[in-house]
Design a protein with these regions (language model features):
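Histidine-centered catalytic micro-motifs
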Residues: 55-61, 96
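N-terminal signal peptide c-region/cleavage motif recognized by signal peptidases
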Residues: 15-18
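Short acidic-glycine-tyrosine-enriched beta hairpin
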Residues: 47-49, 72, 78-95
Length: 127
């Protein structure tokens, strides 16, 4: 019985650690438009602290971004890792698992535009 309890506690700790990593991103919505039909176009500032990560996640629509400050490692499933710096832009197709990690000792900040299915959340955690 003790073994099962310890195992359950270990799995719970891992799940909480994974959740904490996924909440490393702070999104500040700037504008939300109900356009085109059935979609929301959301413009937001996304920030990850130095040494932090957004956590693996997806969006129910395309994401286009522009790096405002800092550097980041962009990890998109099925693609080689990319290092982006202020002034660089990127695109991520709908439903593709990705993560962004602040590179170096500075926080990173991006301007993101998301065109997403309005019946779904802006972002969902991915395994």
């Amino acid at each position: 019985m003790l073994k099962k309890t310890l195992l359950a506690l270990a799995f719970t700790s891992l799940a909480l650690a994974a959740f904490a990593q996924q909440t490393g991103i702070k999104r500040t919505p700037l504008q939300k438009l109900e356009f085109p039909d059935g979609y929301n176009t959301v413009t937001a500032i996304a920030e990850v602290p130095a040494g932090g990560a957004a956590g693996r996640h997806t969006h129910p629509g395309v994401e286009t971004g522009y790096v405002l400050e800092g550097e980041l490692n962009l990890l998109i499933d099925g693609q080689p890792e990319k290092t982006l710096k202020a002034g660089d832009s990127y695109q991520i197709p709908a439903g593709v698992v990705h993560d962004a990690k602040a590179h170096g000792d500075k926080a990173m900040k991006v301007l993101g535009v998301y065109i997403v299915d309005k019946t779904k959340p802006l972002a969902s955690p991915a395994p």
